Structures are given as structure tokens and as C-alpha cells.
């Protein structure tokens, strides 16, 4: 009997008087006890449930009453297996979750190993992560070397051409006496190493050819012009030379 004096749910369902010390009273209250005990009575019977609870210790009876009710509800839905089918389904879910957990652990371990030792997973790691400024410095140094070599070759070619021009003019330019007596009139032809020719005309009164100082000046101007980007070496720099 409950504390309010009304019968418990089991006794109410059985339509009997609930006596003091009823085995069902602590576990089947007045409000919902009747519907819960109806499932137990339908599956196991009231007498079997009473005997089961009576043979258990007091501290285990509440859990046993809940288990009996759950099994009675499962037997109503599946009379053959009852709650066993639910147990199998839950066990399968546990196995699947354990498998997924192992896979995640392995992936986490591999990720940690890859972070700790990147050179083992990727041998080209340090080569790929070479500082960009080192590569740029190497390219710039190579560019300077190439430019310097080209400039050196161009200067060497220019010196050779100018030296050849100097000796060629010294050899192939010969004065001749004109019709004016002491007055020396000369027409000179200069053949450059490139095959082009220019006529050098001059008039002098004493027959002395002053080509050296002016030729040196022209050669110096030609060399400076070539270093500053000039392309015409002979035609623009060597003009008409006068002698006295």
C-alpha cells in the first residue's frame, strides 16, 4: 500500500486489496503502475513476477522490476526474441564504432609522424622549401656574370677593330703632290677590316700629315660611344681628317 492509503498499481490492476508489505507497492506507483504491471502480467504472470521479486535482495528489486517491465514490452513487439534482438543490434553498433575508432587512431598517428619528420615522408621537402631569396640571388649572380662576359667580349672585339683601323690607315694612306707646288693636296682611301671604304680628303701646305693626334681622339670617342650603346663603330666615329 502506498503512503496515501490508495492501492498500488499492481493491486489496482489485479483488483485486489493492497496489504501492508505488498511486494509490488514500492515499484509500481498508483499513476503508471497499472499500465506497467499489465504488460508484466500478460507476459510473465503476476505470481511469477511476485516470486522473482521476493527471492531478490531489497537493494536489487527496483532494478529487477524495471528489467521485467522492459522485457515484457519487448516480448509484446517480438514474442520470439524479445529484447535479445535489441541487444544484438546494440552490440553490432559497438563493434562498428570500435572499428571506426581504431581507423581514426591510425590516421592521427600517421599525421603526427608526418609533422614530426617531414623529410621521411617527402624526401624533397628541404629541396622544395629552399629559401626563395637564395634562388633569386643565384639567378642575379648568373645574370651579372653573363652580362660581364658579353661586355668583355664586345670590348675585346672593339679593341681589335680599332687597332686594325689604326695600322691600316697608317699603311694605306699615302700623300701625293698636287699641282700647286709646295702646296700638298692629298686624297686618301681607307679600307676597314669589314670591307667598307671611306675617302679621306685633306689639304696641307707643308706636306706633313697630322693624323696621329686626331686619329687617337677619334678612336677614343668611338670606344666611349661603343661602351654607352653605340652600334656604328667606323661610319659614325671616323670622319674626314685634315692635315697641314
Curated annotation (Swiss-Prot):
Listed GO biological process terms: callus formation
Tissue: Expressed in roots, stems, leaves and flowers.
Superkingdom of origin organism: Eukaryota
Pfam family, any one: LOB
Domain LOB: 6-108
Expression triggers: By auxin.
Family (UniProt): Belongs to the LOB domain-containing protein family.
Name of the protein: LOB domain-containing protein 17
Amino acid at each position: 500500500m502506498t503512503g496515501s492509503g490508495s492501492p498500488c498499481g499492481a493491486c489496482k490492476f489485479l483488483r485486489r486489496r493492497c496489504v501492508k508489505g505488498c511486494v509490488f507497492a514500492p515499484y509500481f506507483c498508483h499513476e503508471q503502475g497499472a499500465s506497467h504491471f499489465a504488460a508484466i502480467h500478460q507476459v510473465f504472470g503476476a505470481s511469477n513476477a511476485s516470486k522473482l521479486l521476493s527471492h531478490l535482495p531489497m537493494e536489487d528489486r527496483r532494478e529487477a522490476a524495471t528489467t521485467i517491465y522492459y522485457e515484457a514490452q519487448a516480448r509484446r513487439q517480438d514474442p520470439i526474441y524479445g529484447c535479445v534482438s535489441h541487444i544484438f543490434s546494440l552490440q553490432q553498433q559497438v563493434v562498428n564504432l570500435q572499428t571506426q575508432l581504431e581507423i581514426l587512431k591510425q590516421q592521427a598517428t600517421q599525421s603526427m609522424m608526418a609533422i614530426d619528420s617531414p623529410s621521411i615522408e617527402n624526401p624533397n621537402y628541404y629541396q622544395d622549401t629552399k629559401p626563395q631569396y637564395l634562388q633569386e640571388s643565384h639567378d642575379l649572380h648568373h645574370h651579372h656574370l653573363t652580362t660581364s662576359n658579353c661586355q668583355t667580349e664586345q670590348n675585346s672585339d672593339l679593341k681589335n677593330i680599332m687597332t686594325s683601323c689604326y695600322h691600316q690607315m697608317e699603311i694605306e694612306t699615302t700623300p701625293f703632290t698636287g699641282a700647286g707646288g709646295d702646296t700638298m693636296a692629298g686624297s686618301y682611301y681607307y679600307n676597314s677590316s669589314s670591307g667598307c671604304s671611306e675617302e679621306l680628303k685633306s689639304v696641307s701646305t707643308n706636306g706633313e700629315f697630322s693624323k696621329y693626334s686626331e686619329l687617337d681622339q677619334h678612336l677614343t670617342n668611338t670606344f666611349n660611344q661603343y661602351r654607352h650603346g653605340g652600334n656604328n663603330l667606323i661610319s659614325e666615329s671616323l670622319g674626314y681628317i685634315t692635315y697641314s
